[in-house]
């Protein structure tokens, strides 16, 4: 099983940026926790962080075709990353959108996600543990292989 974890703009600043909102855990610490969980269950986990939408799209185009699951925290691209949204829509793997903070308890502009319509599900407000929950959910789809976004939800026509 292959899972991609995509971290959008400014997530490289976790641990320093507004710890009262995003927590004190760094991105490197989050990635290490995720890698440890993945290794324990025999999952290949590839992570990427970029402040540039095009770099995230390049990663998806290179690695996403045979992915069994995608976890994405798009950061600010949540609200305007249409090219990223289109890149995700091309792929067939289940997509879980993760946000460290509860975006619906914050400023109104954060309430709209252009990513959500192509995501299988969304986890918000649970801090770094939201990534672990996403992995656990994807593990429940193990063996279904790429092309199972609708099957994972039981909504395939």
Swiss-Prot record:
Known pathway: Metabolic intermediate biosynthesis; chorismate biosynthesis; chorismate from D-erythrose 4-phosphate and phosphoenolpyruvate: step 3/7
Record's superkingdom? Bacteria
Q: What is its EC number?
A: 4.2.1.10
Name of the protein described by the UniProt record = 3-dehydroquinate dehydratase
Q: Which family does it belong to?
A: Belongs to the type-II 3-dehydroquinase family.
The record's keywords, sorted A to Z, are: Amino-acid biosynthesis, Aromatic amino acid biosynthesis, Lyase
What broad taxonomic lineage does this protein's source fall under? Bacteria, Bacillati, Chloroflexota, Chloroflexia, Chloroflexales
Question: What is the recorded function of this protein according to its Swiss-Prot or TrEMBL entry?
Answer: Catalyzes a trans-dehydration via an enolate intermediate.
Catalytic reaction(s) noted: 3-dehydroquinate = 3-dehydroshikimate + H2O
Q: Which InterPro entries match?
A: DHquinase_II, DHquinase_II_CS, DHquinase_II_sf
> How is the quaternary structure described?
Homododecamer.
């Amino acid at each position: 099983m292959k899972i991609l974890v995509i971290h959008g703009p400014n997530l490289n600043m976790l641990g320093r940026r507004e710890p009262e909102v995003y927590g004190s855990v760094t991105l490197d610490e989050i990635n290490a926790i995720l890698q440890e969980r993945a290794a324990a269950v025999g999952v290949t986990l590839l992570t990427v962080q970029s402040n540039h939408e095009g770099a995230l799209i390049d990663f998806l185009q290179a690695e996403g075709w045979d992915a069994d699951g995608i976890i994405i925290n798009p950061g600010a691209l949540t609200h305007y990353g249409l090219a990223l949204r289109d890149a995700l829509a091309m792929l067939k793997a289940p997509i879980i959108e993760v946000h460290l903070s509860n975006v619906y308890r914050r400023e109104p502009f954060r309430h709209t996600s252009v990513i959500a319509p192509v995501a299988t599900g969304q986890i918000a407000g649970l801090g770094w543990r939201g990534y672990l929950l996403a992995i656990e959910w994807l593990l429940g789809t193990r063996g279904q292989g790429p092309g199972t976004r609708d099957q994972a939800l039981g909504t395939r026509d």
